[in-house]
């Protein structure tokens, strides 16, 4: 079995409304829950009662389309509302991700780490230290999990931010995006995925279900082709 680690905040965990998109039903897509692999159902990353559709579902579905005989397992460790500081290597979210990944790796081969985080750091100039903090997280993950060329796929923040609802104060989202892209360009096996053109729920901060499906396809494209996705894909 192959496996994928999901880390970040609520748009990685997923807040898309489940009734807005067709169900992904595939016995070859598993998720880690209570220490056991079980068939994927959404929400995959149940961190809140409002958890819903995540980009990881369509990422895994795309992977299965091109790997006909294998299984893929999702390791959900994202936490809604978490800042980059909440993912510091001495704190519980990072430690939990390491524990869950090591447990999953006992009977799976980790092939990718999916990261989406930054809404909680898109104000008050927090982008200025984002690059260095992200580097510490990723380098420590690599060392702790003995990862050499496993890709880190990092998603950008939506251009709907800074306008309404809970996203109103996220006025520096574009500056965070620039740091994410700069990090991907500076490091091997790190690929940036744009959120350009994606849409939010009425709350103004969380990607809706259709956009989560599209985002997962973009993440997979970056993973498969080992390159940044800086514009929306055709026919996604």
Q: Language-model segments: which ranges?
A:
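Cell-envelope and extracellular/periplasmic
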Residues: 1-236
